[in-house]
Amino acid sequence: MDDDDIEPLEYETKDETEAALAPQSSEDTLYCEAEAAPSVEKEKPTREDSETDLEIEDTEKFFSIGQKELYLEACKLVGVVPVSYFIRNMEESCMNLNHHGLGPMGIKAIAITLVSNTTVLKLELEDNSIQEEGILSLMEMLHENYYLQELNVSDNNLGLEGARIISDFLQENNSSLWKLKLSGNKFKEECALLLCQALSSNYRIRSLNLSHNEFSDTAGEYLGQMLALNVGLQSLNLSWNHFNVRGAVALCNGLRTNVTLKKLDVSMNGFGNDGALALGDTLKLNSCLVYVDVSRNGITNEGASRISKGLENNECLQVLKLFLNPVSLEGAYSLILAIKRNPKSRMEDLDISNVLVSEQFVKVLDGVCAIHPQLDVVYKGLQGLSTKKTVSLETNPIKLIQNYTDQNKISVVEFFKSLNPSGLMTMPVGDFRKAIIQQTNIPINRYQARELIKKLEEKNGMVNFSGFKSLKVTAAGQL
């Protein structure tokens, strides 16, 4: 599952959404329930004195002239050189302007143009030094543009004022924007407070990336309070921040009652074993999380054991990544045995790929996978053997499938579709792994299934059978 690739939920009508949120109609009520820290007074930039306002006074001009002409006029207005790439691609759904050195005035010209644009759905503006003025132009544009759905303004050094402007916009809930990437913007504790105050009542944003910022434990407390109230977020990336035990516990406490978040990435932080304990307790209660990444968080065998307690009772988690934690064979055992003891476990992917295991572990894992055939456990290798010799695929699974379909005079597509009850060309990874291992026509083990999935998997957690046509197998059976 790729970072932030959870699809947005179907949008409700405005009346339906407001009705659903009626019990939380005031900020006072929200913050009283969450017991959040005192709010930061928000001083909006004075619009009259701001050089970032979208200044074309004749609003009809936004819609009466072509996009190219409007952009050229906007560039002339703000005094910047037009970007040829933008002109060539302004009718495409994805506009990638990462690393273009646009600056705040270049962003302003683009924002003026996008006010009336109906084709760009995804706007990439990473690393453009857009500053406070640039982000203000973008937020003003989003007040008018109801087509743009995804925005990336990572690595733009937005800081506190940028966070304030974004928070003001998020509180209004009046755009189609559902995916927002704010990675690497030097956001600290006060920024977290502003953003969390806005997100506590925002139901539009489904995917939020706040990785590579400077959040520590106090920010973790704000985020935990927000998660207890938020009814929109499905994916949250907080990797590469500075959360330690206090922040980890606060985050996990917020997740206990959260009913929408499916994907959480907190890798490269400092949860430690106490944070792992909080996560384990959360997994006992949470009925929504599907994907959790706690890679490189200083979690030892003790922490793995504590997470295992949650896995024994959890009925929704599918992916757990524990890569680069100091977990050994003992911790690996506790994890797979917890899954074995849970007949309702939906675990599909356990990543302990820095752990060397024993032959006895592999035998136990075989037994676990017999109960849960959708499960794949990725480990480094077998103790005493080189990594290359640890797993032998024997025969390439592609070749096995080709031989079977040739002998039975059926197409490969027909074989794959027979595995899918819906008869479609796509299938969830876990369901496919279970089906390909359990089918009796072709002897495919879990290692071969893993290789097959690598070739057919898309970034959205689905395998696409049409990808088989592009795979070539040599006479030796190698891809």
UniProtKB/Swiss-Prot annotation:
Residue ranges, annotated region (Disordered): 1-29
Annotated SMART domains: LRR_RI
Biased composition (Acidic residues): 1-10
Taxonomic lineage: Eukaryota, Metazoa, Chordata, Craniata, Vertebrata
Keywords, comma-separated and alphabetical: Leucine-rich repeat, Repeat
Descriptive protein name: Leucine-rich repeat-containing protein 74A
Designated gene of the protein: Lrrc74a
Keyword Calcium: no
Organism per entry: Rattus norvegicus
InterPro entries in the record: Leu-rich_rpt, LRR-containing, LRR_dom_sf
